[in-house]
């Protein structure tokens, strides 16, 4: 049986690696990127089933990345952000995200949304 492929796009290495460790322990195949440009490169070459994308990143932020990938791909996207204002959540959802998780979050909260 093929594993479910999750892309984690997060510029904070500690958070990125923590999500990877937890999702792998739950049986997911995890691909990682440090910014939106790397994330798009992985999307174009791998079969991704779900992306977990930070909003604020260098080079290409999460909103820009999701807007670009939505031109060709429709798999679910969970946005991560330290911004917890309702307007930020609405912006993320309007730009193509399926869910929005504010930092800090627990592994169980993220898994429930995956």
What label would you give each PLM region?
Residues 1-114:
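N-terminal/domain-start alpha-helical segments
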